[in-house]
């Protein structure tokens, strides 16, 4: 897929083949999306030497809102590559058309071969589901953190 960065340049998922990509679908109006960003950035910074990159793809939002938000906040999130889906709120959006996203935040962890290794739906402060997802993509994650991610997921599953 292709989205565009703040400067309007195309950003392709295929450009990151060989890396583990956290494809993070978010919007400027989504409170849980914004709440998840500090943790996602910390995780990206911690694992970037292992080839982890975060593509923060703004979806269901206007280009103007995206540009305003990124200009005001990008320094807080140096380990994000922020992009915008030109289809904005249409059914042709990358998030809906290619990934079936019907709620945000959603993070797809894509392995080095370009295959989806794991999915994290939503965000609750203190959870380590993203780290567990990275482990499924072949990233070396502390076994204690992986065990905690499994506990976090079981707690979520129990409340469904």
Give each language-model segment a name:
Residues 1-14, 79-84, 89, 129:
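N-terminal "domain-start" segment that seeds a small globular fold
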Residues 16-19, 49, 77, 101:
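Active-site acidic short loop of glycosyltransferases
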Residues 17, 25-45:
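Conserved redox-active cysteine motifs that mediate thiol-disulfide chemistry
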Residues 20-21, 52, 105:
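Alpha/beta-hydrolase fold active-site loops
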Residues 49-65, 77-90:
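Thiol-based oxidoreductase modules, predominantly thioredoxin-like and allied folds used
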Residues 70-113:
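Short, internal strand/loop/helix patches
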Residues 106-160:
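Thiol-/selenol-based redox modules, centered on thioredoxin-like
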């Amino acid at each position: 897929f292709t989205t565009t960065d703040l400067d309007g340049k195309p950003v392709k998922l295929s450009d990151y083949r060989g890396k583990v990509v956290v494809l993070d679908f978010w919007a400027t109006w989504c409170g849980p999306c914004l709440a998840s960003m500090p943790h996602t950035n910390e995780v990206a910074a911690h694992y970037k030497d292992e080839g982890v990159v975060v593509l923060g793809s703004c979806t269901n939002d206007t280009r103007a809102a995206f540009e305003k938000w990124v200009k005001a906040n990008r320094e807080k999130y140096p380990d994000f590559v922020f992009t915008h889906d030109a289809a904005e709120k249409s059914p042709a959006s990358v998030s809906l058309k290619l990934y079936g996203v019907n709620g945000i935040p959603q993070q797809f962890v894509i392995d080095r071969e370009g295959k989806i290794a794991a999915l994290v739906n939503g965000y609750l402060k203190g959870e380590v589901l993203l780290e567990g997802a990275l482990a499924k993509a072949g990233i070396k994650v502390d076994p204690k953190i992986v065990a905690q991610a499994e506990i976090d997921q079981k707690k979520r599953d129990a409340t469904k």
